[in-house]
A protein has these predicted regions:
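A shared catalytic/ligand-binding motif for oxyanion handling
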Residues: 1-191
Length: 191
């Protein structure tokens, strides 16, 4: 990264529901957007454990790190811009993992003039309850990571309807850490 130029950290997340099936659409979308994202998080790549992808999922200008799934759906991937240095945080991947219920992938991006940034992509399968996710996984994870005094960017599909006020148990958990949940349209609605 050229430290003399102004740099904005710009993440993007997409639930792609099979990267093999939608890889061309992803590349077309990135071409249309014509933006240089710092990190692109992809959930539901459907990369299976013990079965390497059968296609080249490289995107020019990015390095990839991923966590496969042992389910028919799921799996997460981070594309990190080649303009950034980073290192995988597999120790954090393990904290947010439950067989066929939850997958995550994390990387840490070091900066010379500000705190490092931990960026992760999380996929919570619909079968895991919101309470189990927040109490058993998200809350302990956030408590641990907040002690590192680094910026945190969490991307992903938590399968929580943020418009349903009965499911907002995670919002008070995020607020003290200055994390803000965002809601955007799903690819299913855009197809």
């Amino acid at each position: 990264m050229n430290s003399s130029s102004k740099f904005n950290f710009s993440p993007l997340h997409l639930n792609i529901s099979s990267l093999a099936k939608h890889f061309d659409k992803l590349n077309a979308l990135l071409g249309l957007l014509n933006l240089n994202f710092s990190v692109i998080g992809i959930s539901e790549t459907r990369f299976l454990k013990n079965s390497p992808p059968i296609f080249d999922f490289d995107i020019g200008g990015y390095s990839a790190v991923h966590t496969p799934t042992e389910s028919s759906a799921g799996s997460v991937l981070l594309y990190v811009s080649n303009h950034l240095s980073y290192f995988p945080r597999s120790d954090l991947d393990d904290l947010l993992y439950k067989l066929k219920k939850l997958e995550s992938v994390f990387a840490e991006v070091p900066f010379s003039n500000k705190p490092n940034c931990i960026v992760g992509c999380i996929y919570k399968h619909p079968g895991m309850s919101v309470n189990a996710f927040t109490a058993e996984f998200l809350s302990p994870f956030l408590q641990l990571v907040s002690k590192e005094n680094k910026s945190i960017v969490l991307l992903g599909d938590f399968n929580i309807n943020l418009l349903n006020f009965d499911n907002t148990t995670e919002v008070p958990l995020l607020t003290p850490l200055n994390l803000t949940p965002c809601y955007h349209r799903s690819l299913y609605q855009l197809e």
